[in-house]
Amino acid sequence: MAAESDVLHFQFEQQGDVVLQKMNLLRQQNLFCDVSIYINDTEFQGHKVILAACSTFMRDQFLLTQSKHVRITILQSAEVGRKLLLSCYTGALEVKRKELLKYLTAASYLQMVHIVEKCTEALSKYLEIDLSMKNNNQHVDLCQSSDRDVKNEDENSDKDCEIIEISEDSPVNIDFHVKEEESNVLQSTVESLTTEREEMRSPELSSVDMSFKDNEIRILHVESISTGGVENGKFSQPCTSSKASMYFSETQHSLINSTVESRVAEVPGNQDQGLFCENTEGSHGPVNEIQNLEDAFSLRHQCPRCPRGFLHVENYLRHLKMHKLFLCLQCGKTFTQKKNLNRHIRGHMGIRPFQCTVCLKTFTAKSTLQDHLNIHSGDRPYKCHCCDMDFKHKSALKKHLTSLHGRSSGEKLPRHDLERQNLL
């Protein structure tokens, strides 16, 4: 006990911050810097130990080569890359809201996990805040719009009220026609559904636009309404359509808020086939505008696993999480494994971090480098389980199995077929 009491323990809580500040000061004075990072045409001098501790990508670069110069091509902005590397010394990063995706992409490429997590949290936070603000603004606009409809009832007695419905994730246009004498029913229905939307709002609903513009239309999507209140209002009933079920399968019993540019309302409705049938005779509203809207707002993001399509990348990214897919923000290609996405991004950036020590040829993936080394060593590690042939490259084995045996690399021959192959 006496020996333990003689031991004094000191804890320096600010040691990490102080060391980083001094290291950054030495970097600014270009003292003890052992590596130069070139991001496009921008040079950043630093210390390998600091950069390797903050970036897995930089650590792998330093392990693969002993060169004092590392070149990185970041397509978005060299300034973004420089600030990311500088944050390794300062422990802080200032990101403009409109450049959040740029920083997220660059940090993912540099494998700076702590920055990726912060950017992802910030992106989700701002999307939720913007969605809440938009919903509040839309509720006010809906009330004002309903009041104007009631006031103008006498002036427009020969006209029908039109409600354009557009789902958040698809450019489908639906027109409902309500006679002027039933406008009170419409107003009460909209108000009740607005309250219901607050209680049943789905967390998946969002919009990429940060704020409404003056020339945009505030639009409601009415998916299901009680039949008692609708029959008197002469609402149009939907026809059976596979296309309708595709777009509305996940939005039943909910109100979906969205925005559409004012020019959408001007699209002529002269298509030959519509999605909804009219129960009210004599109405001549634009009910066949679906094809025109699809031409104006084509689905820019099509899910590779299901028929759903999306206009906004934020909605598309959220949907891909359901399928456990990883999206390349540069070209839109999806991957089932994150390591394949990282390798794909290196191809966009022009980075080939794996180099052959024999011929100095560079590659984007370690597996490709290993196949290349088999050429120098003469090894043939890939063996066909159907015959005695072996190959240097895995791609050559796959081609052999497909062309000669009609099988993929993961399939094995039945035992009797294998014995027959050996006899031949």
Swiss-Prot record:
Q: Which GO terms describe its biological process?
A: negative regulation of transcription by RNA polymerase II; regulation of cytokine production; regulation of immune system process
Compartments reported by the entry: Nucleus
PTM-bearing positions, type Phosphoserine: 202
Task: Detail the disulphide connectivity of this chain as listed in its UniProt entry.
Answer: none
One GO cellular component, as annotated: nucleoplasm
Methyltransferase as a keyword of this entry, yes or no, is no
Query: What biological function has been recorded for the protein in this entry?
Result: May be involved in transcriptional regulation.
Q: Could you identify this protein by its name?
A: Zinc finger and BTB domain-containing protein 6
Q: Which organism is it from?
A: Bos taurus
Native organism taxonomy? Eukaryota, Metazoa, Chordata, Craniata, Vertebrata
- Which gene name does the record give? ZBTB6
